[in-house]
Amino acid sequence: MSLVAIGINHKTATVDLREKVAFSPDKIHDAMKSLASRTRSGEAVIVSTCNRTELYCNNGDETDIIEWLEEYHGLEHQDVAPCLYNYHGQEAVRHLMRVASGLDSLILGEPQILGQVKQAFVKAKEAGTVALTIDRLFQNTFSVAKKVRTETEIGAAAVSVAFAAVSMAKHIFSSLSTTKVLLIGAGETIELVAKHLKDNGVASMVVANRTLERAQSMCEEFNATAITLAQIPDFLPKADIVISSTASPLPILGKGMVEKALKQRRHQPMLLVDIAVPRDIEPEVADLDDAFLYTVDDLHSIIEQNKASRKEAAEQAELITEEQSHLFMEWVRSLESVDSIREYRSQSMAIKDELVERALNKLAQGGDTEQVLVELANRLTNRLIHAPTQALTVASRQGDLNTLGQLRTALGLDKN
């Protein structure tokens, strides 16, 4: 078995490239089936978030997987390859465990990524691209992530990209008690944003979503107003802060719409935070004098503060992922030994069946019973000891004392 993890994230690539290799929710099912067809085991999971796209495969060729990624998105090798990272075996296992535990996140220890990895796993099972090894890998990973959160302080005062977005808003506006916020999207990230905003006493919130029912459901919890995406132009001029995170393949807010809203606001400043990949807000909005546009790549100062405060907890968590990845690989190796044992037993049984059948034929032809049984025992013994005898002979001739010692131990020759 050969586990491979290939990916791109916020540390290796800009948001421009990340959005080009991202997989939209409506296409990821077919993408996983396509990727799995390029592996020998048919096992593959794609984790695609605003900060990373990662491919986890069992028995896949690294070069072939990279070619698949480039072909799928229509990208040139020289544009993608320098930003990719890859892990094999235990390092691939440990990387997934670190990702799910929040140790590789833009904001150290953020809990949202675990839910995203779980969702990717569920989609892979629905696509039929999960078998024994990948299933065990992800189930173990979820247990490790839980262990990290319960046994370390990595989850204390848990933060996320949503937390960072609200922290930036607090930094720009001295108080949120008089600010009006427009949230675009109604997914998990925006729900976290709404929670942080409510905790900080924001004056009012409006939630715009493609599906009004989903927005209304969320608004009940946060005493907010729900609108459709088509109503955004009417509410945008009233917003001091706009935070957007949808799965839209095209921008939701264009420069023209924001420019018109700023004129209606008499050029009062507007903070826009785009935490979606692909981006929800056209980059050209940043050219407007009274618009202050930030993306996930602009949150580094908050992230660095977070990393510093959690360094000790992260070190403890790293030890857990190292230990657990080692244990998982022991299980993988045990599977390989099971296959070897099964093959050896099958081979031995085939020899036994062949010789017993030959002995029975001789008895049926009137052969002497004692002579037939002795011959059977001798032939069976010689056939079964042939392979280990050859191995002992080769090790002895080559002076390979280490192998010779291991063979003697395995054959029980040193017990007396």
UniProtKB/Swiss-Prot annotation:
Enzyme class: oxidoreductase
Keyword Repressor part of the UniProt annotation: no
SUPFAM superfamilies in alphabetical order: Glutamyl tRNA-reductase catalytic, N-terminal domain, Glutamyl tRNA-reductase dimerization domain, NAD(P)-binding Rossmann-fold domains
UniProt GO MF annotations: glutamyl-tRNA reductase activity; NADP binding
PROSITE patterns: GLUTR
Keywords attached to this entry: NADP, Oxidoreductase, Porphyrin biosynthesis
Site (Important for activity): H95
Catalytic residues as annotated in Swiss-Prot or TrEMBL: C50
InterPro entries: 4pyrrol_synth_GluRdtase, 4pyrrol_synth_GluRdtase_dimer, 4pyrrol_synth_GluRdtase_N, GluRdtase_CS, GluRdtase_dimer_dom_sf, GluRdtase_N_sf, NAD(P)-bd_dom_sf, Shikm_DH/Glu-tRNA_Rdtase
UniProt-listed CDD domains: NAD_bind_Glutamyl_tRNA_reduct
Similarity field: Belongs to the glutamyl-tRNA reductase family.
The protein's name in its UniProt record: Glutamyl-tRNA reductase
Species annotation: Shewanella oneidensis (strain ATCC 700550 / JCM 31522 / CIP 106686 / LMG 19005 / NCIMB 14063 / MR-1)
Upper taxonomic lineage: Bacteria, Pseudomonadati, Pseudomonadota, Gammaproteobacteria, Alteromonadales
Gene that encodes the chain: hemA
